Amino acid sequence: GRLENDSFKLLELKLNLEGNMADKIQNAYETSKNIYDDVLTQRNIFSKLYIKLFWSGTDDNDIARKVLAYVPDDFSGNLLDVPVGTAVFTENKWSSLKNAHITCIDYSMDMLEQARKRLGSHAHIKCIQGDVGNLQMENESVDTVVSMNGFHAFPDKQKAFHEIWRVLKPGGNFIACFYIRGKSKRTDWLVKNILAKKGWFSPPFQTEKELRDILQKLYKETDI
């Protein structure tokens, strides 16, 4: 495969959906739509305790700031945000990029409806339902792909990686953050025994080495 795509920015931290798996993921995010933002942004004491206990106090607000910092404030190309989720972290940044063309995709209509409430009034942003494993986009048509807190939900991650690579222009950037298996036994237990069974996470999950190997086969430069 070609290696022209320039760089991948990784901060530690759909895809051929069919049958029961698709329903499971859809239902999981429908039931969590009212608490999703609260958990990620740690708006209340319960979400703060959950993050501290199971995610080693990871601050998603800080991670989001670091991820979005890789997108220049004067960015004017084509940008793909997948999955967009509720756009709780990206609303301000995407709204400010008036000269860009931004496509926000999510498989979950419940997540997408909330994103549309935040972003729908901006002419340079479109929010559409879609499958990252089968992106309805031309080859080499996107300058930057951002994937924030979403890869863990993709059951066919191999297709997701390939589709993102396919739509990126040579020299384009893939900016993402991932759940990485093997960093915390407590987190791994939570993911395996609760989050995956409920449909919020979908195996397989990569270790840092496995993820690095995947990316280095696709991209000329990886920054982990």
Regions found by a protein language model. Name each.
Residues 144-156:
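A short SAM/SAH-binding and catalytic strip from SAM-dependent methyltransferases
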Residues 1-5:
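Cys/His-rich short segments
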Residues 175-224:
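C-terminal alpha-helical "lid/dimerization" subdomain adjacent to the S-adenosyl-L-methionine
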Residues 78-134:
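Class I SAM-dependent methyltransferase SAM/SAH-binding core
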Residues 72-73, 139, 161:
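A short, aliphatic-rich alpha-helical micro-motif
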Residues 8-73, 88-92, 111-114:
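Conserved class I S-adenosyl-L-methionine
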Residues 158-170:
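A short glycine-rich, Lys/Arg-flanked "PGG" loop and its adjoining helix->strand segment in the class I
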